[in-house]
């Protein structure tokens, strides 16, 4: 039988996903949907531009309401990551910082190991238009730059802060 089986409990665990200043409710909803597909349910929002909660996020979540229902709102990155032991920042460009750079695969392997030890982890994403600025990466002392490889140079946010 194809489709989602809503009678089964949702999986939980894995890293927290932290969206910093997300710009559109639809993007929050699609992030929640991707999280649900991967068995993640800890969504943290830092100062969403269009406020929270969002009807547009619910519409875009396509059944991942349980992720949105648990989503928590934070006033700062520091508050959003305060309970996490390891934080990885996703960025598509060089940051010229003294931070370890990991491939997404290596970061996932590390997180899996830390989570198995009971150490809370999170992945930090910046605003859609500009990405994470260096100040957001410096503020969390535990933050390692997890450099992603976009499918096309056209898909990265503009260079503004580096």
Residue ranges of predicted features:
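Post-transcriptional modification and biogenesis factors for structured RNAs
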Residues: 1-162
């Amino acid at each position: 039988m194809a489709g989602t089986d809503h009678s089964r409990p949702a999986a939980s665990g894995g890293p927290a996903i932290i969206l910093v200043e997300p710009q559109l409710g639809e993007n929050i909803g699609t992030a929640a949907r991707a999280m649900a597909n991967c068995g993640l349910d800890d969504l943290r929002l830092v100062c969403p531009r269009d406020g929270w909660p969002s009807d547009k996020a619910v519409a875009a979540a396509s059944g991942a309401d349980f992720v949105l229902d648990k989503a928590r709102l934070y006033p700062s990155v520091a508050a959003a990551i305060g309970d996490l032991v390891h934080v990885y920042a996703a960025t598509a460009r060089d940051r010229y910082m003294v931070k370890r750079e990991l491939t997404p695969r290596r970061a996932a392997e590390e997180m899996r190991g830390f989570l198995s030890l009971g150490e809370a982890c999170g992945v930090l994403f910046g605003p859609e238009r500009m990405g994470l600025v260096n100040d957001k990466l410096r503020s969390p002392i535990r933050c390692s730059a997890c450099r992603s490889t976009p499918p096309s140079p056209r898909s990265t946010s503009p260079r503004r802060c580096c």
